[in-house]
């Protein structure tokens, strides 16, 4: 291979060997230290590749002729979902996926915080059919509605046929929705404000929510909506109205049917609204919550602060073993459904605070609840803890922290800060909450 030739879009490079497999699921090859990330190429596989795009940090390429296959490779079951970038690890057998994620987590913790102990990594019971929620894109083009996933790194629709990440009944429901849409296409074409549709599903209770995500308040016809109703299903249909950049949710309108879904974690039931956060892999969630219960060794005199609590699944799940729970969540809908769920489960020792976690912790120093017996549970979004939350921890007396993270990189960043506050990492465990993807859920216990 001539390494000195100019790298450009469309260039074909022969006999490339992937010497690494990146965290994001690309085979990695370098020319003069410049990385080329190759889709659908595992470590040690050899292929002819074509450069698709280039920026200042790396190039992206695709395989045009794979010449060797890794023993870790398996056939793609669902090519549409893979093309959309939703299952980047589907090319790898499941045992190898677990080993890969464990290696990523182990290397990151060793490099960033000096953790040298073994990190156990818990596989999912189901490597497919585990999701209880999906969102499909909605595009009107040439007087036609296209609905499906965006092809990876494009705005080209991959039409929905099935998704291996949801189960058969959920797939059937989505296909029936699309069939109804096709049968009434002319009426739906007037709704140019719809940009995506979110589906939520409770398998145990056979309940569905459909949420139309829109950019203005043009009301969707109840006559059209009612055609989605089936006698054997409990369905709720909503319209979310966003600002024009599709980022900020302005308003939610209930159009038809049920207000919520019902889920069960262990012996506890939870009500979940159209915009309430709920983990998408329920079986893994139960494993994590049981592990938290074991790790905390609760005596009964503790107060637990459930921070970024969502509908307070963790707080409610542990409440009967605690003196009290303080649930802190900014989202109004989530707080309302958390209150409903607490009442449903006869949990009375829980206090709900609808407030941004940063603002709450800024004014926490004089709070009478904070003492050595109490526990903090953090389950933040992907960007991790706000610096002001970490700063506030300097002045409060909490000996135990549970940190549940969906982003290992922001997790280790925050752990460095907590270690600086004299906390010690006592336990680390990884969970495969998202099989076929590179995402990793990590549970950490800290003490001081």
Where are these regions (language model features)?
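Short, conserved phosphate/pyrophosphate- and ester-handling motifs at nucleotide-, phospho-/glycolipid
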Residues: 44, 166, 281
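Extended interfacial segments that mediate partner engagement and assembly in macromolecular machines
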Residues: 64-190
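Short, acidic/hydrophobic/Gly-rich beta-strand patch recurrent on exposed beta strands
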Residues: 27-32, 148-152, 338
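Internal alpha/beta scaffold segment
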Residues: 156-195, 202-205, 216-241
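Rossmann-like S-adenosyl-L-methionine
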Residues: 4-10, 15, 20-25, 217-448
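Terminal RNA-binding accessory module
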Residues: 1-80, 113, 359
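Short, solvent-exposed loop/turn elements at beta->coil junctions and helix N-caps
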Residues: 120-127, 195-200, 243, 429-433
């Amino acid at each position: 291979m001539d390494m000195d030739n100019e790298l450009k879009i469309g260039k074909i490079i022969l006999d490339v060997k992937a010497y690494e497999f990146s965290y994001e699921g690309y085979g990695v090859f370098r020319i003069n230290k410049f990385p080329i990330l190759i889709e659908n190429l595992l470590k040690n596989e050899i292929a002819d590749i074509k450069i698709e795009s280039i920026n200042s940090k790396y190039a992206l390429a695709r395989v045009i002729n794979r010449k060797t296959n890794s023993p870790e490779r398996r056939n793609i079951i669902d090519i549409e979902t893979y093309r959309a970038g939703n299952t980047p690890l589907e090319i790898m057998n499941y045992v190898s996926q677990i080993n890969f994620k464990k290696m990523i987590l182990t290397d990151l913790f060793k490099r960033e915080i000096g953790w040298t102990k073994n990190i156990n990594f818990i596989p999912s019971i189901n490597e497919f059919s585990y999701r209880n929620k999906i969102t499909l894109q909605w595009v009107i083009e040439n007087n036609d509605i296209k609905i499906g996933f965006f092809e990876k790194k494009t705005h080209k629709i991959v039409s929905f046929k099935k998704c291996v990440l949801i189960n058969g009944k959920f797939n059937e429901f989505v296909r029936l929705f699309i069939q109804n849409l096709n049968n009434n296409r002319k009426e739906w074409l007037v709704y140019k404000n719809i940009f995506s549709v979110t589906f939520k599903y409770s398998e145990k209770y056979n309940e569905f929510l459909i949420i139309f995500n829109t950019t203005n308040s043009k009301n969707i016809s109840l006559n059209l909506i009612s055609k989605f109703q089936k006698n054997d299903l409990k369905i709720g249909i909503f319209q979310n109205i966003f600002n024009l950049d599709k980022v900020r949710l302005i308003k939610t309108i209930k159009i038809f049917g049920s207000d919520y879904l019902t889920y069960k974690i262990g012996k506890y039931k939870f009500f979940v609204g159209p915009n309430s956060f709920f983990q998408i892999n329920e079986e893994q969630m139960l494993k994590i919550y049981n592990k938290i219960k074991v790790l905390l060794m609760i005596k009964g005199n503790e107060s637990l602060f459930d921070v970024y609590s969502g509908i307070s699944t963790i707080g409610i799940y542990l409440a009967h073993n605690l003196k009290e729970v303080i649930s802190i969540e900014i989202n109004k809908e989530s707080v309302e459904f958390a209150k409903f769920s607490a009442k449903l489960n006869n949990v009375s020792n829980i206090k709900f605070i609808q407030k941004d976690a940063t603002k709450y912790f800024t004014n926490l120093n004089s709070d009478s609840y904070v003492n050595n017996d109490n526990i903090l549970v953090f389950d933040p979004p992907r960007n991790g803890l706000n610096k002001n939350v970490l700063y506030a921890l300097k002045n409060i007396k909490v000996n135990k922290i549970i940190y549940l993270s969906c982003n290992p990189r922001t997790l280790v960043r925050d752990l460095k800060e907590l270690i600086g506050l004299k906390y010690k990492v006592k336990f680390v465990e990884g969970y495969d909450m998202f099989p076929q993807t590179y995402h990793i859920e990590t549970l950490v216990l800290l003490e001081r």
